[in-house]
């Protein structure tokens, strides 16, 4: 998801 850039899943 592009949202990963804003919400990085660590």
UniProtKB/Swiss-Prot annotation:
Family note: Belongs to the SA81-like family.
Lineage: Eukaryota, Metazoa, Ecdysozoa, Arthropoda, Hexapoda
Domain of life: Eukaryota
Tissue distribution of the protein: Expressed by the venom gland.
Alphabetized UniProt keyword annotations: Secreted
The organism of origin for this protein: Isodontia harmandi
Misc. remarks from the entry: Negative results: does not show activity on voltage-gated sodium channels, potassium channels, and calcium channels. All the following channels have been tested at 10 uM: Kv1.1/KCNA1, Kv1.2/KCNA2, Kv1.3/KCNA3, Kv1.4/KCNA4, Kv1.5/KCNA5, Kv1.6/KCNA6, Kv2.1/KCNB1, Kv3.1/KCNC1, Kv4.2/KCND2, Kv4.3/KCND3, Shaker IR, and Kv11.1/KCNH2/ERG1, as well as Nav1.2/SCN2A, Nav1.4/SCN4A, Nav1.5/SCN5A, Nav1.6/SCN8A, Nav1.8/SCN10A, and DmNav1, and the nicotinic acetylcholine receptor alpha-7 (CHRNA7).
Compartment list: Secreted
Name under which the protein is recorded: Venom peptide Sh41
Main location: secreted
This protein's GO CC annotations: extracellular region
């Amino acid at each position: 998801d592009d949202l990963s850039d804003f919400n990085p899943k660590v």
